Structure formats: structure tokens, C-alpha cells
Amino acid sequence: RLVGSEMCIRDRHIQDYLSANCFGDYVSRGGLDAKVRELLTFSMLLTLGGCEPQLRGHIQGNLNVGNDKRTLLAVVTQLLPYAGYPRTLNAIACLNEAIPENE
């Protein structure tokens, strides 16, 4: 499931739209490799705020394409003056939840 267990079966059309549009059109476009695309998505979700479930998903997406916690933390640090402390701290909490310190 793309958006978690809270999505009901009656919302299947939304799931289908997300799959076709976001995970089809945008991901399959050229110009950016998967690592850069995931870093940009992570950056945008971080700065939007209130997107922690999606942020967690794209933390995993970043790990899947070869970006590591150190790289993600560097992105968070770079965005601190633009996104602010609350969103930065939320992103760090998501990172630490997804990738514990001992990993």
C-alpha cells in the first residue's frame, strides 16, 4: 500500500491514480538518476512539513537506491535555515526511527 493502512478499499481509485501518476510518470522520466530523484523528493517532503508518513517512505526509498543516513542527514542540515527547526527535527526523528544509530 502506498499510503499506509489507513487507506480504505473504497479509496482504491486514489491508490490507482497515485500509482499511475506519481510512481509511473514522474519516476520514469529521464534527466535525473534514482539517487538524485529520491534526494529531491526527501528534501521537498521535509520542507513541506506534515508529511512524516511519506517522508518515512522516501527515507526507505533513498536507502533502496543507495543513499545512506549520512547523506540524508547532510540534506537535512543543508535545509535547516530554509525549512526551520521544527521540520528539521521532525525529519531527524524520522531518520533515527528508520535507521537506528547502531546501523
What are the residue ranges of the model-derived segments?
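Short alpha-helix boundary/capping elements
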Residues: 22, 44-51, 83-84
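Secondary-structure capping and boundary motifs in well-ordered enzyme cores
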Residues: 10, 32-36, 68, 84-87
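Extended intrinsically disordered, low-complexity coil regions enriched in Ser, Thr, Gly, Ala
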Residues: 49-74, 86-100
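Short, small-residue-biased leader/transition segments that mark boundaries at the very start
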Residues: 2-9
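Membrane-interacting alpha-helical segments
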Residues: 34-39, 95-98
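Short, recurring structural edge motifs at helix starts
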Residues: 26-29
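Short helix/strand-capping turn motifs
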Residues: 15-20
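Short, structured motif recognition centered on aromatic/hydrophobic residues
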Residues: 36-46, 55, 72-79
